[in-house]
């Protein structure tokens, strides 16, 4: 039999090296398993709609997300064109549907408003964004 002997007196390629080969194969298989990207929560639609012009001031802003969001870590704010916060400060996730985030508004005058949202999805991934809507002035 040909083969090189190692210090233990066993030939290379014997049972001693078998666990190393199996470990290597298992590591390659484990690393090749696809991993889910997670359930980041992104807006699906909103009311008022992104970029819309409203004839009547909305009573609130609602955003529907494509997945559930964490109530304790999700906020929604509305700002006027000078950067002043104008919402009622009652931002909340809908208790009956954790994909909806809403905030109340006072009667707003004509102008352009920026909606700013920040949410944590159930998988703990953070997303945030902004959009604008306008309220028509009297002609």
Q: Would you name each region that the model predicts?
A:
Residues 104, 109-118:
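A glycine-anchored, Pro-Gly-centered beta-turn/N-cap motif
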Residues 96-102:
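Aromatic sugar-binding surface patches on proteins
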Residues 38-57:
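N-terminal edge beta-strand
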Residues 89-92, 103-105:
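Beta-strand-rich interaction surfaces with strong enrichment in secreted/lumenal proteins
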Residues 61-62, 67-89:
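Short, surface-exposed alpha-helix to beta-strand junction/turn motifs within ectodomains of secreted
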Residues 24-34:
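Bacterial N-terminal signal peptides
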Residues 3-24:
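Bacterial N-terminal signal peptides that target proteins for export
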Residues 54-56, 60-67, 124-139:
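Extended, polar beta-sheet/loop recognition surfaces of beta-rich domains
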């Amino acid at each position: 039999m040909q083969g090189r002997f190692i210090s233990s007196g066993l030939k290379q390629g014997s049972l001693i090296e078998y666990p190393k080969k199996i470990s290597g194969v298992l590591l390659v298989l484990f690393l090749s398993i696809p991993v889910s990207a997670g359930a980041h929560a992104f807006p699906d639609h909103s009311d008022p709609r992104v970029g819309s012009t409203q004839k009547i001031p909305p009573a609130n802003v609602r955003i529907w997300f494509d997945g559930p969001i964490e109530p304790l870590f999700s906020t929604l704010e509305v700002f006027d064109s000078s950067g002043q916060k104008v919402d009622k400060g009652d931002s909340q996730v809908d208790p009956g549907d954790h994909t909806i985030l809403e905030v109340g508004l006072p009667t707003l005058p004509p102008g352009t408003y920026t909606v700013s949202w920040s949410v944590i999805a159930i998988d703990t991934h953070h997303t945030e964004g902004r959009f604008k809507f306008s309220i028509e002035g009297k002609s």
